[in-house]
Amino acid sequence: RRNQNSIIAHPLHGVFLKKVSGAQILNNRIQGKTTLAASTDPVEKGIGQSTENCDTTLVANRRGNGIHQWNCEENLICGNEISDARDGIYFSFTNNSRVENNSIHHVRYGLHYMYSDANIFENNTFTENAAGAAIMFSKNMVVRGNRFVSNRGYRAYGLIFQSSDNSRLEQNEISENAVGMSFNQCNQNEVVANRVTRNYIGLRFGSNSDGNRFTENIFTGNLHPIETGASDVSGSLWAVHGVGNLWDTEHELDLNRDGIVDLPHRELDLFGILRRDFPVIAFLSESPAVKLLRFANERAVIPGMGSIEDAAPLTPQFWRIRAQSPNYRTRTALLKNK
């Protein structure tokens, strides 16, 4: 039940696990098949003429997965490097497993979860993929300490959450992606202490997502911090126990110097889903008219505009101030031990 220290080069499929419990896939290097030998068509070549074999590009959707699990329990996938596959690691009806310290690049989805519950993945790196990770129709997940970086393209994402509930995302770096995070039909999730920076869209918030709690996250350097479209986002909290998130803002009124801004932060999504059909509209993001609307929305909610409200936004000094507090150090230690 252990596969380790192997080099698996150019397979159509890498490692396949079916109804396996307690397996360990450790420290392997899996590089998928990117070309496929094909013969020229004898009809096109002409009767009596010799045909030739040539390599054709095997597009990502026609490749197999690097590691594929179906109907498994309690497996460990650790220390692997996976590239040039369809999905790096694919879970289907697989529960109570761990994915740790893997590096996955140049695939479709780095990590793809379907109908798989109570799994933990942490300290993995996902770069140069169509999506770093896609967690779909799953619950009770822990996503901790991962790097979703430079997943770029017209429809590229750092992290996709689709119809997934009661999960925890914490201390992840989500940077330089086309879309940092996407939430759609997701409920009762905790999003804590993640760095969502330098993405084209920081967080795309879809429909029917309620009861999600965002706190201590950093949303800075994103061209568009939030995209809500026509979705109602009032059912989620952007500050928990009086602690919100760090945003790009020019106004940081903190009279008592506790690291929490004294006025709420309202993030306005002016163009919403229009960006998908008309990308050039992004050039208006820093126009004087848009800046004026943002300024007005900070002071009073503009009816009919997509907006989220963080009741307790943070200053950059928040973490330094709280780190000096004994109560905060105790709370941080408890979070790390969860």
Predicted segments with their positions:
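Consensus "Asn ladder" position of solenoid repeat domains
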Residues: 3-5, 23, 28, 75, ...
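Long, low-complexity, polar and repeat-rich extracellular regions
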Residues: 204-205
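Parallel beta-helix/beta-solenoid
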Residues: 2, 10, 15, 20, ...
